[in-house]
Amino acid sequence: MLRQGIAAQKKSFATLAAEQLLPKKYGGRYTVTLIPGDGVGKEVTDSVVKIFENENIPIDWETIDISGLENTENVQRAVESLKRNKVGLKGIWHTPADQTGHGSLNVALRKQLDIFANVALFKSIPGVKTRLNNIDMVIIRENTEGEYSGLEHESVPGVVESLKIMTRAKSERIARFAFDFALKNNRKSVCAVHKANIMKLGDGLFRNTVNEIGANEYPELDVKNIIVDNASMQAVAKPHQFDVLVTPNLYGSILGNIGSALIGGPGLVPGANFGREYAVFEPGSRHVGLDIKGQNVANPTAMILSSTLMLRHLGLNAYADRISKATYDVISEGKSTTRDIGGSASTSEFTNAVIEKLAKL
């Protein structure tokens, strides 16, 4: 079903939602859940809202303003909103390492809505100086099990057991998602990241499942495997060898941070999360930015580009193309870039530069 009716452009992002599961328009407009999150979330989502208003994009926002520091019961407000609207744009909720009493709201949201696939796009951007150029890889991460299952307990004082859950059903689901993504986006290979040399049952199940799905259902694509520690080294040394990486939960988080460093930082990485019924778009590297909150210096590029992925998901491709081009043009010219990529512009100045560029397109 996912292969039907959706055309892909070469090396561009193609949605994987079935058309019948997309939200309905009311009065010619979509309603989208907006979750600013913590840290710089409000600043960068404000950039998107301003750009969308300037472009008269037919989207209304339902804002759910809660913090990751709040009780997990509050995540229900976001869940209920997303169930109504089916699509969301989200900042990152902060989960302190020493937090006790409740788990991550980010994880809770993904589990409750079964948003099982995280997609992060790592592509070199002209105008951003980095050690390596022409990087173009995708990390597809299973979002709902693995080390993030949240099953921990102290069996006796001083002894903690953390359970890693891996299932064939969810491994098959993320494998098919990755292969479908590769086909729709004219990618050539899918590489399973694992640690099956040590975790022979859990990661062995994941690796073998990806291999079987690829060999039996997607013979036109190359299927590869790599151990996660080697993948980390290869990503730093020779990232051009990678096309689409499919990973269990934890490995995708680690490799995603490596990928963001390769292309210039977390402020440049767009991302999306998909389930069967719902889609939530957020920066791909999931950095909160608490240290620069309220300073008007955050790079909104990742959030802006994530919003263009959302527009394509909704079939609003012309708006997405305009905003993407304007954003890339501003970065390429280098006159109004933020300090994380060598400039001195503020968040609002970068946003205004994108709007000015849009007026000239």
From Swiss-Prot:
The keyword Magnesium appears for this protein: yes
GO cellular component: mitochondrion
Residues annotated for Mg(2+) binding in this entry: D229
EC assignment: 1.1.1.41
Cofactor names: Mg(2+); Mn(2+)
Site features described as Critical for catalysis, chain residue numbers: Y148, K195
Residues that, per the record, bind substrate: R110, R141, D229
Cellular compartment(s): Mitochondrion
Keywords for the protein's UniProt record, in alphabetical order: Magnesium, Manganese, Metal-binding, Mitochondrion, NAD, Oxidoreductase, Transit peptide, Tricarboxylic acid cycle
Reaction catalyzed: D-threo-isocitrate + NAD(+) = 2-oxoglutarate + CO2 + NADH
Principal subcellular localisation of the protein: mitochondrion
InterPro entries: IsoCit/isopropylmalate_DH_CS (IPR019818), Isocitrate_DH_NAD (IPR004434), IsoPropMal-DH-like_dom (IPR024084)
One Pfam family per UniProt: Iso_dh
Function comment: Performs an essential role in the oxidative function of the citric acid cycle.
NCBIfam families xrefs: mito_nad_idh
Subunit organization: Octamer of two non-identical subunits IDH1 and IDH2.
Family named by the database record: Belongs to the isocitrate and isopropylmalate dehydrogenases family.
Name under which the protein is recorded: Isocitrate dehydrogenase [NAD] subunit 1, mitochondrial
Species annotation: Kluyveromyces lactis (strain ATCC 8585 / CBS 2359 / DSM 70799 / NBRC 1267 / NRRL Y-1140 / WM37)
